[in-house]
Structure formats: C-alpha cells, structure tokens
Amino acid sequence: MAQGIGDEVAGWRDNAIASGQAVSGADQRQFATSVIHDRLRQIAERDISNGIGALSPEEDSAVIQAALDDMFGAGMLDRLLADPLVENVDAIGCDRVWVSYADGRKELGPQLWRSDAEMIDHLRRLGARSGQAERRFDNAAVELNLQLPSGARLFAVMAVTARPCVSVRRHRKATATLAELRDSGTFDDRVEQFLAAAVRARLNILLAGGTNAGKTTLLRALLGETDARERLVTIEDNRELNLSAFGDRHQDVVEMEAREPNTEGEGEVTLAELVRMGLRMNPSRVIVGEVRGSEVIPMLNAMSQGNDGSMCTIHASSSEGVFDRIAAYCVQAPERLDRIASNLLLANAVDLVVFLAQAQTPTGLRRWVASIREVVAAEDHHVSSNEIFRAEPGSHAAPTGVPLRPQTMERLAAVGYSWPPTLQVVQ
C-alpha cells in the first residue's frame, strides 16, 4: 500500500509544483495521511460487504503509522533505532541484518524488507527526499550517502555487491557535554578543564581517531563551550552536527552540506568549495565535520588567517600520524603542496591534536582520549610537536609533564586556566 500511495503523493506533489505551488514535507505528509484514510475506508467497505470484519481503530492507527514511516521515515530501520542502545546497523540484503549495541554486543536483527528489490526501492525513496538535493540510487549511481530523519547516517551500495548493502551509524550522545563525556569515562576532569579552556582561548583543534571513535560526539561537546551568539559555519559531506537543532546553545549557525553531481555530471559542490564559501560569511569559527581530501588546504588557510577557534576531524591511527595524513592530502590537492609547504601550513594553523581511541572490553566498547599533542613548529620534512597528555593502558590521559609553549600558556591564562594541572603526571 505504501508504494502505491507514495506514487500518488509524488504525482500530486509534481502537479502542485508545476502549477507554481510551494509544497513542504508537512504538506506531503498531510496529503498522504488523507489518502491512507480513504484507502482504509475503501478496504473496510469491501471487507464488510464480503462478510469480513473491519480493522479495529488500533489496527487502523498501526497501519497508518507503518505506511507513513515507510514513506517519510526509514521504516523498520527507525524501529530498530528506537532502541537507545543501538549504535550501528549493517544489512546484507533484506534479511541478513547485524545490529551493534553500545555495550559491545553484536546480534542478528529482524528482516527489514520483504525482498532485495523492495529494499532498493525503499532506499531510492529515501534518497529522493534527502537533504537539499535529490540523491539517486540505481545502476548508474550505485552508492547512497545520506542522513536519516532520526539523525543517523546511512550508506548503501548496490550493483557492485552480490546483494544490496546498507550501513547505518547513529550518534547516541548527540547533545553530550564535556562533563557528560567525563562522567562516561572518555577523560578525567584535568582533560575536561583543559579542553574547555582551549575552546575559550580560541585554539585551533584537530580531532583524530578511527571510525566510530567518537570524534563527532566530542566535536559537538567542544562546540558546546562556545558562546551561544558566536557565528559558526559548519561544513560537512552529510549533516551530522545539526547544531541548529540546539537553538539555545547555538543561535547563529550556517550549516553547509556538499552536493553530489547530477546525472549529467554537473552541479557538484565539494567540501573545498564550501570552505571557501564559508569564509565569506563572516564566521567566528569554521567547523569541518571531516577533512579527507583537498579541502584540507582551504581549511588550514582559514585557521591561519584569523578564524581562530576553528575545528575539524580527521581519520588517523595516532596523534602523531595526523601530520602524515595531512601531508598526503596536501600533495593530492590541486595545489600539489610538497611536504615542506604542507608542514609549514599545518604548523601555522593547528594548535592542538586530540586523538581518540576505542577498544572492546569485557564491559563493552570503551572510547577515550588517548593523546593530546601541541603543535610547535615546522622543521622541513618534520612537524615538531609535544605530547602534553597521554593515556597509559587502563587509565585516563594524564599530563606528561612537557611544558606548553609560552604563547599557548598566555592564551590559556587569559581565559582563567593555569598550566600545568596539579595532579600526578605520567612518567
């Protein structure tokens, strides 16, 4: 039923737009609800005439909600994600569904679609109404990358795998504060106080770690330390930060999202282009959700040219490994910066690198800040840095006893923070 009604809603929408009417998502949902009621009434009249009992009001409501979920939500995926402990969902075809939980469990979940064809069709409908531009999903566009209405991130592929595959990642702690991350064991009060002061002092911060290490969650928490009236420009492949949803905490936010090319290969807007656009919008801070290509150069330029307090995330296997990763991105960018030039740009732009680690423990998945490194200078083919916090096995990151640069200490002192922390240091 949902497919037929979806086609009817799409036809009504297209006709309305063609006649010059503005059609919102709420308008489409309202129209769909009225169509569903009409269909159910027709079914009830037919069943009664055939001597079959009609649906109860509760069953009617369940059918209406299921149809609306299928058309405007993510269907069964939404029902899985309703469990607050669910972190990841990975489906191989319609019926091989793995669910990963926050406590470390990984279990087979329920079948999500009746067939692989229905799975592809549902994903195609999700892409058609995703973000600010329709995203295709077919043999000519074999990957789909979008954000679900619930805020979870979905990636799907077809035609290049034996069966269509879907991976969904959800940020369970969308509004976590530094204090809440401290209480959950991500770091102790010394790191909490240092990071909060670093944000207030407008140090440029790069968050690093592997997939699912908690980089976006920590980035949101750091941004929670900014003044509510600061103008933030966020730049992402897919909107995950969603700072505008927290209007009391972030009152002046411009959220920018990259756009894929259309079927003619036109209309693409890259992260690098968005960074350049964002710099023209009077930002107080520029935030790049994930640096992974040529956007690294305009981002570093933004950090070194007056947009102090900017932040971004990057995939890396260690805090020191970030420097090699950025150099690789710089040499692949259109500017083709060599290692010496990229190191000089990085050293003039980034103040701190915060590295997050993760590991499976008997009590579940643990995520923690494993290292904080201060960038000191560029020395030809090497970036000089000091590891100022380090986590030993089984412990929180603690001060290493290495002093900060005088310039950094002055900026921190100006916001009321005294270095070094007074607790015991790691030897």
Q: Can you annotate each of these PLM segments?
A:
Residues 215:
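Conserved lysine of the Walker
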Residues 99-201:
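P-loop NTP-binding catalytic core
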Residues 1-137:
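N-terminal accessory targeting/assembly segments
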Residues 198, 210-211:
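P-loop (Walker A) phosphate-binding loop of NTP-binding proteins
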Residues 218:
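Hydrophobic positions on the alpha1 helix immediately C-terminal to the Walker A/P-loop
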Residues 72-82, 126-147, 230, 333-340, ...:
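Active-site phosphate-binding and catalytic loops of NTP-dependent enzymes
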Residues 203-205, 221-347, 357:
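Switch/coupling sub-region of P-loop NTPases
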Residues 361-427:
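NTP-binding/hydrolysis catalytic cores, primarily Walker-type P-loop NTPases
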